[in-house]
Amino acid sequence: LSAWADKGWVPDVLGVDYAGLIAKSPHTEGHEAHDHIWKNLRAISSEFKILLLTASQVNKEGYNSWYLSKVNFTGSKGIWAHANAAIGINMSEFERDSQICRLNYIVLREQEFLGELPSKYVAVAGSPHRGRFHLISRFI
């Protein structure tokens, strides 16, 4: 990114596939290593003023949860400390067959500007293979 920035170009969006696979520093272990990764990702997005997107795997309880929350993720609390927003993406078998997924906020930094964190979800349907998605419900 620095080399591109030096040439006058910085992307608007950077996707990291995915944060859990980033090599850990040999000087850190366990939760400290995870925290270090998330801290660095946050620093990159702040320094270059870009939207940085990544993914994280849920624990086994997350597969049966209607809404995803912080308890559905293992590892460091650094994920939540450094993310501006974390959005859960989930679907039942019926929804998968119908090409519908549910999105809900897990973390939303500066949510005081929005009031309370919305407790409901938004459902999105469409043809993901063609990149055509449609909003079929809204936060209530």
Enumerate the predicted regions with their spans.
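Conserved H-loop
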Residues: T54-Q57
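Short, active-site-adjacent cap segments at secondary-structure transitions
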Residues: L21-A23, N59-G62
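C-terminal regions of RecA-like/P-loop NTPase motor modules
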Residues: L1-G15, T28, S46-F48, K60-I140
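Helical hairpin unit composed of two closely spaced alpha helices linked by a short loop
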Residues: D12-K49
